[in-house]
């Protein structure tokens, strides 16, 4: 059996591999996919981001983020929407087509994870989910500390 740090490392490497494969599937570079993924996560959480927030997250200038957003919009992956609270500003959204492509591509992995999760007892599931959430908190903390 693998020790815990190695198992977590293997999980991170596997997740990175999924992102690389998904980026290729969408015809994107890994860095462009990273931007798209951030927009999707922000959108899912109900806190959509604009180009300025995306630039801050990626550690790039606003001008570079605008070029990136333009590229993703031209490719049909992102759209700009006026913000309800300030129509002079925009937030970014992943297009429905791209969202469907991502969901279709990830469906086999999601189904397998669901199958594995269902094979656990309720207590095991709770323990694993709690542990994974704590790992996520630690990883987010590390990435927040490293942010410019």
Could you describe each region identified by the protein language model?
Residues 60-62, 70:
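Membrane-embedded alpha-helical bundles of multi-pass transporters/translocases
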Residues 70-126:
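Charged, amphipathic alpha-helical coiled-coil/dimerization segments
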Residues 124-148:
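C-terminal regulatory/oligomerization modules of transcriptional regulators
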Residues 19-60:
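N-terminal helix-turn-helix DNA-binding core of bacterial DNA-binding proteins
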Residues 4, 11-14, 109, 116, ...:
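Amphipathic alpha-helices that form helix-helix packing interfaces
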Residues 1-28, 75:
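N-terminal leader segment of winged-helix/HTH proteins
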